[in-house]
Each structure stands twice: as structure tokens, then as C-alpha cells.
């Protein structure tokens, strides 16, 4: 059984890529799938359940046994990808989970009535048992956004009448695709806050959403603010992964060249975010009083208070109370373009006080970095330096 190749064409050497990732400080997640055509319940369709489940289990065991051991030492394995039933977008069957009556012609395809039961009994629980046997963690197979959250709850809580077990009890990390941060709250409250799951991942975000240059920096900043208020006690408790980061479309993170790899707008925006909020993160509890036309959220990064600000053009204002301990100290505030990383001139940011209320005035340029958005907005970071001692 060959388990040493990867990529869409299976022409890349998997062991060497995993070792290269490790040397570069990059963690690796292996996705387990799909079905060999000769074992497919839908003839010739690798996105259907296996006829012989033992073949699937042999494959999973071979992969996890090899790659959870030295020198790879992988701890996370994702089972399948986007298995679901009927989708809200109108598809009667998921793109990666096919059953009887599937047709490449959407008009001829009919719903897969046993989609949930077959997935739980023939794919997920058999694989999850093997993964845990090797003391590794089970990552759910990326619930698609068009599958619907209510339906996802139903799948997670499904108890197999054959195996007498719930799928949820065989999931360590809830995993979804392309959801906004706000949609993670119900998953956290029901499955992570008090268990049984260890955390929430999104193994696909981005794609064409990245046509909006604000999408990635807003998503990751919102994600961090949200996670900091949700017992973020393990580095891998909350993760998001960008799909796909490399390509020739201008909204991908990088352009592969020739002559050399370069960063596109979305890639540069993440560099700016890392440079601006790259310190140890902590939550900031004091409310932000935003002026008209301004929306903002905040966190602490190292010694700095970092606010991500979305606003219209012109002079704008944010006030923050309860910071009287800072009044006796010199305050430096910077206004940084979230896409380019360019800092505004010193005269475009002003700090004043009204008792314990710190007022921050900043000038948003007429040429906004989200000029094509509706309505046009400018995304920036308002950073107050060396404030930690005054806000903790």
C-alpha cells in the first residue's frame, strides 16, 4: 500500500515534505481519504463510501502508524473532507461525499438518504478509533459552510444504532470551512467549553473571499479577540488555515513567479498583522467608545494596545475609559494601514484626556484601502505603545 505520495497528482514525496515542514517550524495536518475506485460503493467514484470497510481501516492504520512515529511525530489527522448531505446552495449531495443516485449532472442527482449514517459508521468512527489508538488527535473532516450549522449539530450528535456510539465522542477538534467567527460561538458553547471536544479549527478559509483585501486581517484579528475570551489555554486549541495560499489569481497570498515568488495584497496584509500584533496576546476588557463611522475591536500584544479599526475617511475618534494610570506617562499612538503597513504621519494621530477617558483622534486617508467595498472602508491598526502596566 503506497502512502508516500501527496499533492493533487500524487507526485510529491510526502515524507520529505513533512520533514521539511518540521525544519521550517511548520506543523502538518494529514487528511485521510478517499476510497479506491475498485472499492467504491458508487462504481468508480472515490468520493463514495467503501464497500469493504476493512480496506479503509488498513489504509488509515498504515498512515497513522507511520506518520505518528519518529521522525515525523504527527499528532493531528483529519478524517475525509466536507462529508455532508444536501447543501443549502442547492446541491442534493456534497461535492466530496457521494451515494446512490449521484450524477455529475446536478439536475439528475438525488439526495443521499444515508449520507450521515454511512459516514459515521463506515468512515469516521472506524478511522477515529485507529487514530486514538496511536495517541493522536482526531480532526473532523471540515464541515462545509453550505451544510448548515443545525445540520452539523445533528451529524455530530448522531448515535449509530450499529456501533452504539456518537460521532461526537470520536472528535477531538471540531472542524468547519468558511464560517465567520461569530458562527463558532454555538460550537464552542455546546462542544468545547465543557467538552468533549478539545477545540475548534477551520481547515479552509479564504479562497475567493480574499478578493476583499480586508477579509484575512479582519478574520484573524476577530478570531484572536474571540479566542482570547474562550479559555485559549493551548496553542492549537483554535486554528484557521488558508485555502489556498499560492496561485496566479491576484487575491492569493503569494504569486509563484517567475521570476520569483512574491506576496500579493492578502499576503502582505498578514505580514502587517504579524508585525503589528506579534507579541504575547491577551484580552482587553475595557469598552471602546467609537465615533460615527467607526467600528473597532482590541487586544493586547506584548506591551501594546492594538485596535483594528474599520472606518470611513476623515478625522475619526475612539475613546477608552478606565486608563487613568496612563495619564502621567508619555503616550505614543500610531495609525498603521492594515494592508500596506504604512504608518500615518505623527500629526495625523492625537491623544488627549478627559479625566480617566483617553481620546484618540486619527485621520483616515481619502484614498482608502477598501475603496471597492460597499460601502468604502479603510482598515487600519491604532496602536497605543507600552500601555500594559496601565491597563492590567
Short names for language-model regions:
Residues 174, 181-183, 209:
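Acidic/histidine-rich catalytic cores of soluble enzymes
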Residues 304-392:
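C-terminal beta-sandwich/jelly-roll accessory domains of carbohydrate-active enzymes
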Residues 144-147, 189-223, 227, 244-258:
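Active-site clefts of carbohydrate-active enzymes
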Residues 79, 140, 176, 202-205, ...:
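Conserved beta-strand positions
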Residues 75, 172, 240:
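Conserved acidic residues
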Amino acid at each position: 500500500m503506497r502512502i508516500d505520495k501527496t499533492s493533487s497528482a500524487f507526485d510529491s514525496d510526502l515524507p520529505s515534505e513533512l520533514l521539511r515542514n518540521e525544519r521550517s517550524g511548520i506543523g502538518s495536518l494529514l487528511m485521510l481519504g478517499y476510497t479506491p475506485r475498485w472499492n467504491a460503493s458508487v462504481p468508480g467514484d472515490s468520493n463514495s463510501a467503501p464497500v469493504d470497510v476493512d480496506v479503509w481501516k488498513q489504509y488509515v492504520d498504515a498512515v497513522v502508524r507511520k506518520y505518528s512515529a519518529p521522525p515525523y511525530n504527527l499528532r493531528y489527522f483529519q478524517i475525509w473532507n466536507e462529508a455532508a448531505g444536501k447543501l443549502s446552495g442547492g446541491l442534493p449531495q456534497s461535492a466530496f461525499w457521494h451515494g446512490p443516485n449521484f450524477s455529475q449532472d446536478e439536475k439528475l442527482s438525488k439526495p443521499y438518504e444515508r449520507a450521515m449514517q454511512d459516514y459515521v459508521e463506515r468512515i469516521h468512527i472506524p478511522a477515529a478509533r485507529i487514530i486514538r489508538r496511536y495517541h493522536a488527535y482526531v480532526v473532523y473532516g471540515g464541515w462545509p459552510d453550505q451544510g448548515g450549522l443545525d445540520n452539523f449539530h445533528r451529524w455530530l450528535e448522531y448515535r449509530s444504532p450499529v456501533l452504539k456510539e456518537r460521532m461526537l465522542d470520536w472528535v477531538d477538534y471540531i472542524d468547519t470551512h468558511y464560517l465567520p467567527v461569530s458562527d463558532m460561538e454555538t460550537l464552542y458553547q455546546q462542544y468545547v467549553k465543557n467538552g468533549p471536544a478539545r477545540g475548534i479549527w477551520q481547515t479552509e478559509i479564504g479562497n475567493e473571499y480574499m478578493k476583499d483585501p480586508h477579509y484575512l486581517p479582519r478574520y484573524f484579528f476577530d478570531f484572536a479577540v474571540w479566542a482570547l475570551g474562550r479559555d485559549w489555554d493551548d496553542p492549537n486549541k483554535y486554528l484557521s488555515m488558508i485555502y489556498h495560499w499560492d496561485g496566479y489569481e491576484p487575491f492569493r497570498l503569494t504569486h509563484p513567479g517567475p521570476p520569483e515568488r512574491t506576496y500579493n495584497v492578502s499576503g502582505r496584509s498578514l505580514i502587517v498583522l504579524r508585525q503589528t500584533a506579534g507579541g504575547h496576546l491577551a484580552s482587553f476588557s475595557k469598552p471602546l467608545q467609537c465615533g460615527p463611522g467607526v467600528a473597532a475591536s482590541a487586544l493586547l500584544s506584548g506591551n501594546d494596545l492594538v485596535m483594528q479599526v474599520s472606518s470611513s475617511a476623515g478625522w475619526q475618534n475612539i475613546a477608552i475609559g478606565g486608563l487613568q494610570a496612563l495619564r502621567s506617562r508619555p503616550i505614543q499612538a500610531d495609525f498603521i494601514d492594515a494592508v500596506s503597513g504604512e504608518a500615518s504621519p505623527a500629526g495625523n494621530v492625537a491623544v488627549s484626556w478627559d479625566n480617566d477617558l483617553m481620546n484618540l483622534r486619527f485621520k483616515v486617508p481619502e484614498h482608502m484601502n477598501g475603496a471597492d467595498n460597499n460601502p468604502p472602508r479603510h482598515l487600519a491598526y491604532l496602536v497605543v505603545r507600552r500601555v500594559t502596566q496601565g491597563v492590567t
